[in-house]
Swiss-Prot record:
Ranges of Gly residues composition bias in the record: 180-246, 288-324
Segments for region (G1): 494-501
Designated gene of the protein: infB
Region of interest: G4: 594-597
Protein name (record): Translation initiation factor IF-2
Native source species: Desulforamulus reducens (strain ATCC BAA-1160 / DSM 100696 / MI-1)
Biased composition (Basic and acidic residues): 49-58, 65-89, 99-113, 349-377
One GO cellular component term: cytosol
Amino acid sequence: MTKKRVHELAKELNIENKELINKLMQIGISVKSHMSALENDAVEKVYHQYGKKQEKSSDSANKQIQREHGRGQGMEDKKEKDQLFRPDNAKGPGLVDRVPNRPPDRRYEDKAKVAQKPAQELRGSKTTTNSENEQTAPRQGSAQQSGQGRPQANRPQGSQGRPYGGRPQGGQSRPYGDRPQGGQGRPYGDRPQGGQGRPYGDRPQGGQGRPYGDRPQGGQGRPYGDRPQGGQGRPYGDRPQGGQGRPYGDRPQGGQSRPYGDRPQGGQGRPYGDRPQGGQSRPYGDRPQGGQGRPYGDRPQGGQGRHYGDRPQGGQGRPQGAGRPGANRGAGPSIPKPPEQVAQPKPTKAPDKTKGDRRKNYEKDGKWADGQIEKNKLFKGRNNKNKKRQHQQSAPPPILDKKPVQIAEVITVQELAEKLKKTAAEVIKKLMGLGVLATINQEVDFETATLIAGEYGIETELKVAVDKEALVMAEPEEDEDKLVLRPPVVTIMGHVDHGKTSLLDAIRETNVTAGEAGGITQHIGAYQVERNGKKITFVDTPGHAAFTSMRARGAQITDIAILVVAADDGVMPQTIEAINHAKAANVPIIVAINKMDKPDANPDKVKQELTQHELVVEDWGGDVIAVPVSAKNRTGLDNLLEMILLVAEVHELKANPDRMARGTVVEAELDKGRGPVATVLVQNGTLNVGDTIVVGQVSGRVRAMIDDKGRRVKKAPPSTPVEILGLSDVPEAGDILVAVEDEKLARDVAEKRKIRKREEGLKSSTKISLDDLFKHIQEGQIKELPIIVKADVQGSIEALAQALEKLTTEEVKVNLIHTGVGAVNETDIMLATASNAIVIGFNVRPDNNARKLADAEKVDINLYRVIYEVIDDVKKAMSGLLDPEFKEVVLGHVEVRKTFKASKIGTIAGGYVTEGKIVRDASVRVIRDGIVVFEGKLDSLKRFKDDAKEVAQGYECGLTIDRFNDVQEGDIIEAFTMEAIKREI
């Protein structure tokens, strides 16, 4: 016996190969793949596992025959209906192949022989009784008693199990030849006189090779064999005493040429002929003594409503014989004789036959059989064997449940065409019909897309837009079993020059302060220290007032805040700010009282000042840990580290290293050789080289990672600070880093954020409306100080921008037209030339080309290393833009003692300088009785007919006032001038 392979057995059991392999493993049978061969006992075990027994070949053949010939009741009825009354579907093998003397098809011989024995067992004891009943019944009488005019009724002396009953005394020239009494080599097996085991029953004394057996005293060339005393050429054989040319044989004493034969004593005009003593208007005519309204007429003394009527004393086991569903046993009453002539119904018009059907109905002598042309027109395609086979093989198309097409609020024509499964040209044509001229890349709204889909009968629904940014930023739920302890993140905060970086240097045993400009920290640094086998991550923040955002950012990413306070200086403004940041972030605070080595150190003063800000140390009954240290002498450091580890242990800081990384950008810069570089603190998950990340408005792939000691690493677990390379641009400090799996998703989120920030910048920019235009013209032009800032790191730019924007006043505004990380380049100089801006470089230098271009364009480049100097110089520049204040300075007074009138000059006042001096170009006021009569300019000043620039106190002078001649004796003329005073911010 051939061994079965795994895939063959899986196919037989209708399961997947993988499922079968797993099942074999469970029962102790080892297989390597789906091509492995299985022993018989292994196959038996599998059958036992799935509750299936191994079938024998005879049973399989029997079941196959039962499936082919519709042994079930419901399948039998349906098949018989299709064969009798739906000719287009009756094209199976052995049904209506009318080619004369066609040799038998040997493909069915083996199948019939194998099926003979189980078929005999199925009919068993019923055979003897049926055979005796059929032998005692007269031939013609049996046809009449079983109801004449029935399609495919039994024939006398019939064998059991035949679809059309037995045919005695068969004729010649049948499509499949005669059946002898043994009848070997027939496509459906032998027909013995008992007819057991044949799928279509036996033929008594029959001809060989006929698909439907012999007809008694039959005519030649009939596709369904002879009928007793019947006419020739009928598709279903003769009926006793019947007329010719009827598609279902003769009816007793019936009329000729009716499409479905005569009915005895029947009414005319019925589509399928008359029925004996029947009611009219039935779709298939009357049945003798039958009930009305049955789909296939009455049966004599039979059960009503049966599809194929009764069989007289019929043999059991026949597809249409007695003992089948819908049939009665016993003979019915004789049918009354129908009238000799009945009006012939109008023939039904049918479409022309195909070439293959016409050829099958053409006889050897080149002539058509009697009545064959008309009947072939009625039953087009009945004999098409290939079509029947195709009909059996082709399954009906599955009914698809049409789901609504999801369409976004805005969709391009090309995408809409793809969703509707149409071409873009068809969709554009529909749009033009709606009056919309669109190209394939043009977008249409949801309503228009719905109208187009409705034209094709497709329903639509609005697709809910997925917020990709929310999807990326969503924090997944953590599995408690996967959380492990992580190092604490400690931020060192405090006032400037209180020793924060020196304390961190002492812990790290390095010297960072030596390399800092001005001795102050101006950007965040992240470092990792290992002490007693446990790691601690330190984040150093600036203490200067300009770096508020850095301190706030440091507090947000930290687990523990170390507040450094100088023992000799106490709590200062930035110390208070750091306390507020730590409280806002809900971070535990450890106070490090530094500079204990100084002689004037006073730790109690520090503790007392801390209580004013709700920080009560443990020594005073509070819960705040205070540790005195000296960064210079390196004392108290071990105690400080122990306190850090203690607080971290109490808070049980945990993270999941097996998930996608998430962290915060501590600092970012543009390196000339490496490109954008970001210092990132990984807070959760593990960041690996090659991960796709999105950082604020920037996305990219991690090309390399460098730890705080300058070593390249391949992965960064939680609480690890690393520098990453591979970003598309310099991110902003404080941005959240998220590792994602889809690179396209990262790009989309970054681009969306960039667009949103640009729109926010446009909205926030101050604009002068038409309503305010006249007001601004009257008040004077708004003065702006355009500035271009270039710095070494992103954090410094952030600090500078915030510090400079605070300098803005109502009269002068600081306009940061461009900020960037990296050296000053030619683009910055060209932008400064166009906008008349000043260039500020913080810890960067201009390259040679930029310096040459700046000299040519006369652009001033200001370079700084300390943030104090930047703020002071910008203040001076802004002060120069302010309008000066004017102050009135009184020069002197002149008493008018005599007036003279000159025709060409006007009134000349002669006076005496009583106080100060009087200057020729000075402004004057004419005061009369303490009231200012006129204020204007001095026109001329003379002494003894000579022009004088000024006249001092105690001297006389003559003067004229511009556009004023009403000077009287006794008036006081006050000389004054307006002096401009420079304003400062």
